[in-house]
A protein has these predicted regions:
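Metal-cofactor-dependent catalytic cores
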Residues: 1-264
């Protein structure tokens, strides 16, 4: 196995950037999900998991690192992330602030994604609050653990583009590798170049992969196929449709496109 592609998302729920290499520290991918939009009314982190309010974020793109992170709006305007509050509030129809500080216990709204598929993106559904970054130290706005991986075996089975699942690392698997093989990697050290990761959870899937991503149309199969073929127990969350794998960083360092991937 080897690394097929590497991805970083400087602003949570926006499209990100494809890179030749990533640097990892014990908090995850440096520069990943360092910014997020916060709903000024409720103080909740904006995420397209709640498509009724936030799906337009997936029409925006973010790139860069540190204070140089830039946001490209759907109309083509490019803005510094730290000064994009006004234009993003206008786009979303809700007042937001762009933040680099993840509050303790920060939460997002997460309606049941299968109900979203059944009843529509604008349906007024119950939206339980989910605390983010429960498996991540530091202040990045990741969903759970520091790093997210998915294999080409799983992507080929589902039949969607990798970017819909928003992984950091896409792993090429040999011909004949079963889909959802990531389930079998839990608890086994994962070595990528000089970096060691420890898998923590299968990745539960939400509404995000089914939504429009930039110019890409909706893709309901990105949820339906995992729901049909890979409902698994996710510790602390129940039995959920999953695709991919979360991991924590045991040994930090750089990883590069083409690096070998080994399972302990």
């Amino acid at each position: 196995m080897k690394v097929a592609s590497l991805h970083r998302y400087p602003v949570k729920s926006m499209l990100g950037e494809d890179l030749a290499s990533l640097d990892l520290d014990t908090h995850g991918v440096i520069g990943d999900r360092v910014y997020a939009l916060v709903d000024a009314e409720h103080g909740r982190v904006a995420t397209a998991k709640q498509p009724r309010h936030w799906r337009a974020l997936l029409r925006c793109r973010s790139a860069g690192s540190g204070p140089q992170v830039q946001v490209v709006l759907p109309d083509g305007r490019t803005l510094a992330a730290g000064s994009a509050d006004g234009p993003l509030s206008e786009l979303l129809g809700r007042k937001v602030t762009v933040s680099t500080r993840r509050a303790d216990g920060a939460v997002v709204e997460r309606p049941d994604p299968e109900q979203v598929l059944a009843q529509g993106l604008d349906a007024d559904l119950e939206a339980p609050l989910l605390e983010i970054a429960q498996g991540t130290p530091g202040g990045r706005f990741v969903d759970h653990s520091p790093v997210h991986l998915i294999t080409t075996a799983t992507l080929d089975e589902v039949g969607v583009e990798a970017l819909r699942y928003r992984p950091n690392v896409v792993v090429v698997t040999p011909p004949g590798t079963p889909a959802f093989v990531e389930n079998d990697w839990l608890g086994r050290p994962l070595t990528i170049g000089a970096v060691t990761l420890v898998p923590t959870l299968p990745t539960p899937r939400c509404s995000v992969p089914t939504l429009e991503h930039g110019d890409l149309p909706r893709a309901p199969q990105a949820l339906r196929r995992p729901a049909e073929r890979n409902r698994v127990e996710v510790e602390g969350f129940g039995v959920l449709p999953c695709a991919g794998l979360y991991a924590r960083v045991e040994t930090p360092g750089p990883i590069h496109r083409g690096d070998p991937v080994e399972i302990g």
